[in-house]
């Protein structure tokens, strides 16, 4: 879709906003992307990976929320509570680092216990380095290796379409 926007004409902007709203209505399955605070240190840097992935998913029409436990100073329990209380969430993606890998796995186990219908995916340094640790015993449905901007859309489409098609390179 290409829309030319004139400086004094906001009808094209409204048309584009309508188009995006229609896409959002089509995508009933909400995605939450999250990361937990590390136990080892505290910084005020935002997780750009979550922001990039959110932008890519929203461009494809997904309703995405970021719950950044690290930047928001949220406890693991608060992150878990927000996820479990969201009745629209269908997919949770967890950004994992060496400093929060074990906590991320524990979060996934607890989500799986209470809301087994939620699809769980993870990415980041931990899953890229040792994906088996994250998918072992069905904790996460998928561990993404490397950059996730392309694969997260394909995986999200796969989960929301309940497809039995094969995902390339998985």
Q: What kind of region is each of these model predictions?
A:
Residues 29-41:
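Nucleotide-activated donor-dependent transferases that construct or modify glycoconjugates
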Residues 49-57:
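Short catalytic helix/loop segments, enriched in acidic residues and glycine
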